[in-house]
């Protein structure tokens, strides 16, 4: 990358900052949830919606981001994404009620949904093909640092300032990024086909109302009749999309994708698997603070080993899959993650706090192996003409399943606990114990899906991918 022009390197820095902002925000909020609840006068059991509102908005908006970038231009959309994300951060900091905070987080989600995919598209357009991998490695590195810094930084700001600062720190970075985008980023456009607005709206309605219905009366206060109505609307919307996409070459996501067995199994496993995994980043800091009495900063520091384990495992995951095959790796890591979740709960409740960093490091390793294996399994056998559509659908499913996972975790806390749990409550640890046991069971369920993956122990993943790209 050293032979790239200075202007191109500056543009890559802009994209990298966007990746950093988006990835930092996915983890920095988790540590602050108990403090937010106290400040806003809410039960900690309701605060999962702060995460859900952001992640669900990202899932809904992702399918439109690439088309908008091609139609309006990458500079215009990337600038808009940064501005919306920054404004959302400002409104989050100014929020005085939970509902105001949820609306502001949704605005952040609109910006976050466009920032990363449009950033990837920008790199593709400004960097020669032979240097694309090196450029993507450069711009995604800050995105890996964000989750590492997020929990500890969030805890530090909450403990020594206030939760508002986890959003306020985005504002100067966002302003600099927006100005730099206007000054340095070229506005590439491409000829686009007509956007599938009908399909987009049907999917958006289906995902949003079903997630809202899942939150149930505990979180939303809706009556059983209203929840049943939401479920009916969501199911009808998704069925209508399936009918709409049948034999429709302009559909948002072609149903031809599901003719590839590994894609179908991988997508189903990714959806179910990330529901379980999505609970962990939300539940762990909440449990450490409310269940065990850790300070926000201490709870944030405890999350760092999990991120380090995840980053370290990425270097050898291809060799692991090549040696043992997708089916064995995915079944083993799914059951292993369930056992590690139980181990974390047991060591924490026994008071063996010195063991927790090692358990969380192991959790990060297992989770990272499973994530990487699920992603490559889902996409590896798709024909070239469906690869882009399949990748977009996988990205949307990843965000949707994470929002559902956090929603279920909040629902479990509400089912087992009272409306107001606290460190002083004698029943609090019992509430968390039942919640962790339920989570471990949910995490183990996708093993039944992965057991149906063809036995490909001797299929070399790296060679297979090189052959596909060469064709």
From Swiss-Prot:
Residues 33-48, 98-101, 159-164, 218-224, 284-285, 363-395, 452-471 are cytoplasmic. InterPro entries: EmrB-like, MFS, MFS_dom, MFS_trans_sf, Multi-R_MdtD. Pfam families: MFS_1. Keywords: Cell inner membrane, Cell membrane, Membrane, Transmembrane, Transmembrane helix, Transport. Disulfide bonds: none annotated. Gene3D superfamilies: MFS general substrate transporter like domains, Multidrug resistance protein D. GO terms for molecular function: transmembrane transporter activity. GO terms for cellular component: plasma membrane. It is found in: Cell inner membrane. It comes from the Bacteria. The chain crosses the membrane at residues 12-32, 49-69, 77-97, 102-124, 138-158, 165-185, 197-217, 225-245, 263-283, 286-306, 342-362, 396-416, 431-451. Residues 1-11, 70-76, 125-137, 186-196, 246-262, 307-341, 417-430 are periplasmic. It is a multi-pass membrane protein. HAMAP family: MFS_MdtD. Belongs to the major facilitator superfamily. TCR/Tet family. PANTHER family: BLR6921 PROTEIN, MAJOR FACILITATOR SUPERFAMILY MULTIDRUG TRANSPORTER MFSC. This is Putative multidrug resistance protein MdtD. It comes from Escherichia coli O6:K15:H31 (strain 536 / UPEC).
């Amino acid at each position: 990358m050293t032979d790239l022009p200075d202007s191109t390197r500056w543009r890559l820095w802009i994209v990298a900052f966007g990746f950093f902002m988006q990835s930092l925000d996915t983890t920095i909020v988790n540590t602050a949830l108990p403090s937010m609840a106290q400040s806003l006068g809410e039960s900690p059991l309701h605060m999962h919606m702060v995460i859900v509102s952001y992640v669900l908005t990202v899932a809904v908006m992702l399918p439109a981001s690439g088309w908008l970038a091609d139609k309006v231009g990458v500079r215009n959309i990337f600038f808009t994404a940064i501005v919306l994300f920054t404004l959302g951060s400002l409104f989050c900091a100014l929020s005085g009620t939970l509902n105001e905070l949820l609306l502001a987080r949704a605005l952040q989600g609109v910006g976050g949904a466009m920032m990363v995919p449009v950033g990837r598209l920008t790199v593709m357009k400004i960097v020669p093909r032979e240097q694309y991998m090196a450029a993507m490695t450069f711009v995604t590195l800050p995105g890996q640092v964000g989750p590492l810094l997020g929990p500890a930084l969030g805890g530090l700001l909450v403990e020594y300032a206030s939760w508002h600062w986890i959003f306020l720190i985005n504002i100067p970075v966002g302003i600099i990024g927006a100005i730099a985008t206007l000054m340095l980023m070229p506005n590439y456009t491409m000829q686009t086909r007509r956007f599938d607005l009908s399909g987009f709206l049907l999917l958006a309605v289906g995902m949003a109302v079903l997630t809202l219905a899942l939150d149930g009366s505990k979180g939303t206060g809706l009556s059983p009749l209203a929840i049943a109505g939401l479920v009916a609307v969501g199911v009808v919307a998704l069925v209508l999309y399936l009918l709409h996409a049948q034999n429709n070459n302009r559909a948002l996501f072609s149903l031809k994708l599901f003719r590839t067995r590994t894609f179908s199994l991988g997508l189903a496993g990714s959806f179910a698997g990330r529901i379980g995994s999505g609970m962990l980043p939300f539940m762990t800091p909440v449990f450490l603070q409310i269940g065990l009495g850790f300070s926000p900063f201490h709870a944030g520091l405890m999350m760092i080993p999990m991120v380090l384990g995840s980053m370290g495992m990425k270097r050898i995951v291809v060799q692991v899959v090549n040696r043992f095959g997708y089916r064995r790796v995915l079944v083993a890591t799914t059951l292993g993650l369930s056992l590690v979740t139980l181990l974390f709960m047991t060591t924490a409740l026994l008071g063996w706090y010195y063991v927790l960093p090692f358990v969380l490091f192991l959790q990060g390793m297992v989770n990272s192996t499973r994530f990487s294996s699920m992603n490559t399994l889902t996409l590896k056998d798709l024909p070239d003409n469906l690869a882009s559509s399949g990748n977009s659908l996988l990205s949307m499913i990843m965000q949707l399943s994470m929002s559902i996972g956090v929603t279920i975790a909040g629902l479990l806390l509400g089912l087992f606990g009272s409306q107001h749990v606290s460190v002083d409550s004698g029943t609090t640890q019992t509430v968390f114990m039942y919640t962790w046991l339920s989570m471990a069971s949910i995490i183990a369920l996708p093993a039944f899906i992965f057991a149906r993956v063809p036995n490909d122990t001797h299929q070399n993943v790296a060679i297979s991918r090189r052959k596909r790209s060469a064709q």
